[in-house]
Amino acid sequence: MSPMNAFDSQTEDSSPAIGRNLRSRPLARKKLSEMVEEELEQMIRRREFGEGEQLPSERELMAFFNVGRPSVREALAALKRKGLVQINNGERARVSRPSADTIIGELSGMAKDFLSHPGGIAHFEQLRLFFESSLVRYAAEHATNEQIDLLAKALEINSQSLDNNAAFIRSDVDFHRVLAEIPGNPIFMAIHVALLDWLIAARPTVADQALHEHNNVSYQQHIAIVDAIRRHDPDEADRALQSHLNSVSATWHAFGQTTNKKK
């Protein structure tokens, strides 16, 4: 009997154990769409289709792979999620290059689910603190005069938005975005944008009046961060940033407690 036949003829009771409790069993068969996806991905990575080039039409792909339209569409959708193709209505899929945003986008669903678990927000706030702490230290040591001017402009917009909560949130995000831009690393930018999006989405709804005092405190803390960066003092910039983010975390935690009591 061949090894394959011997494998196939094993019963559940006689099959060898793998690890502690697992027993050998046939691997699940791949869907047609997964096979099409893998083949197209390999063709793209081998440069058979270059960046910006259109893939064959759905009908041509159906004929080439001898599969139905649903399999082709599922395969193209999977490639889009990987950032390997762009799909616009009425046009053939076009080859693209994955970006840092593609990577973060794939994590978004898992991140939002994690945030909904007990302690999830605190873990992400700690991640943000560690991340931005490195950013401000880098900024204090390496920021150019032009980059410091951009921080000052973001700070000015911040000051003009104190009485408008929606505008202040936008200016607050923009201020921290300018910080994240200073190293010139697109992965840092993608991580930072995603972190803020995830955390802001998880915050409770708070009345505008309750936010006004918080806005003023945040603005003053932003000033302290910029002043330390302007003096090229990484230790002071780090202290100012940590004071700011710890204050923000405590404020939103208090808002959340108040909101829960009202429910």
UniProtKB/Swiss-Prot annotation:
One of its GO terms (biological process) is negative regulation of DNA-templated transcription. Residues 1-24 are annotated as: Disordered. Residues 58-77 bind DNA. The keyword DNA-binding applies. Pfam families: FCD, GntR. InterPro entries: GntR_C, TF_FadR/GntR_C, Tscrpt_reg_HTH_GntR, Tscrpt_reg_NanR, WH-like_DNA-bd_sf, WH_DNA-bd_sf. SMART domains: FCD, HTH_GNTR. Residues 30-98 form the HTH gntR-type domain. The keyword Ribosomal protein does not apply. Keywords: DNA-binding, Repressor, Transcription, Transcription regulation. GO terms for molecular function: DNA binding; DNA-binding transcription factor activity. HAMAP family: HTH_NanR. Transcriptional repressor that controls expression of the genes required for the catabolism of sialic acids. Belongs to the NanR family. This is HTH-type transcriptional repressor NanR. The lineage of its organism: Bacteria, Pseudomonadati, Pseudomonadota, Gammaproteobacteria, Enterobacterales. The gene is nanR.
